[in-house]
Amino acid sequence: LEAAALTATYVTAPEARGPREGLARYDETTTTTTTTTRGGATRATGRRRLVAVVAGDSTACGVGCGDDGRGRTRGETAAGEAGPTLARAFARGLGERMTADVEWRALGFKGADVRGLRDKLIPALREATEGAGGRGDDDDDASERDGRGRRASVDAVVIMCGLNDLKHSIVGRRSETFRTELRELVREVRDVVGDECVVVLPATPLEAATLFPPPLAWVATRMNDLWDEQKAHVSRLFAHNVLFVSKPSLDAMRERAAKHTGRVAESISLICGDGIHPNDDGYDAWARHIADECVPSLERALAAQK
């Protein structure tokens, strides 16, 4: 009953403003990346540009970005003006680890469960691959197209999902249904991007949420773990290039945020004012954790293509 009441009264934070695509440029002199919108000046580095898509539910479209954690939107925030933090930070983290420029796209659908993502994401992903710039050498746009007029393939697709499916458990939907739908979604994604693309299924660190009072918080966390176990199960159904990423601990996320912001870890809030979605710091820490975990798989996938 308490869960049903929260579902009925919950008000979500708004989506991030700004672009849904951009470019994280790797700076060899500082070993860091800077994020820009696509279409800026290019560099003839001879280095392959990577392409990453962060797709899925409200976390992919940046719900909570620009919120200071107390329900107030900051006047000038990078996430508020530059698009979803999760996709941008994932591209930055990937670029720093892979020493490469990373083109990013965010394909988020607020409120979507996995069944909804099968209807909405696949057409959007197919359209996005028409404009993905992956295998060029950072020359002009025309040189990045292949002989069919298409851009080259996407290197990584991160699928954010689970929380909206978890809400369906209130009305009796089982975790096995989520697993079946997710398996089909992954297959459909791979039909679009190819088996050489790394598909990433991250677990959700729901422990950071402040929305749920005890004992509901303990129940919600355990249920979330059960849904995350289905992601791990799905990843094992595929021979290669489907990766489950376990969730980071709260301490690890705060340490990452402290390193990024220069603030004391214990003082950092990771959740926006709606009590469940990450704020900018939370998204950044989570995204960099995902990036770190998927680098070995991505390196193997790229090596296999040579």
Can you say where each PLM-predicted feature lies in the sequence?
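N-terminal secretory targeting modules
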Residues: 1-54, 60-67, 297-298, 302-306
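Conserved SGNH/GDSL esterase-like catalytic core that processes O-acyl groups on lipids
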Residues: 49-53, 59-180
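A structural motif corresponding to the C-terminal end of an alpha-helix
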Residues: 97-98, 185-200, 230-245
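Alpha/beta-hydrolase-fold catalytic nucleophile elbow
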Residues: 160, 202-203
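Short "lid" loop at the C-terminus of a central beta-strand within the Rossmann-like core
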Residues: 164, 205-208
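Substrate-gating cap/lid alpha-helix
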Residues: 209-246
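Short, flexible, mixed-charge acidic loops at enzyme active sites
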Residues: 254-268
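Histidine-centered active-site loop/cap adjacent to the catalytic His
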Residues: 267-306
